Regions:
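Acidic, polar-rich N-terminal leader regions of halophilic archaeal proteins
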Residues: 1-91
Length: 91
């Protein structure tokens, strides 16, 4: 997951780690599968993050997508990124 994020989106190492961890937690919870009837895969995540505005970092894109899921289904707020440790960034 982290490698796929690095290839496609700007962000810091800490953001990539945090988003990858949140994605694992979301997948383990099987919430997307239950709500949308589809498996949560790296491709599904990347496709949805690509829909976010271009100027957003990877963590902001993640929160943008999770915000949409929260509005549509509820129960996604706990998977959003709240804080990210400071780290080196990739553009």
């Amino acid at each position: 997951m982290k490698e796929a994020l690095i290839k496609r989106f700007a962000g810091s190492d800490a953001e990539y780690e945090t988003v990858a961890r949140q994605a694992r937690d979301l997948g383990d919870a099987e919430k997307v599968s239950k709500d949308r009837g589809a498996q949560l895969t790296v491709d599904v995540i990347i496709r949805n993050l690509q829909d976010a505005p271009d100027e957003l970092s990877v963590a902001e894109r993640w929160n943008w997508w999770l915000g949409a899921l929260e509005v549509a289904y509820g129960g996604y707020e706990r998977f959003q990124v709240r804080t990210v440790p400071q780290g080196d960034s990739h553009s």
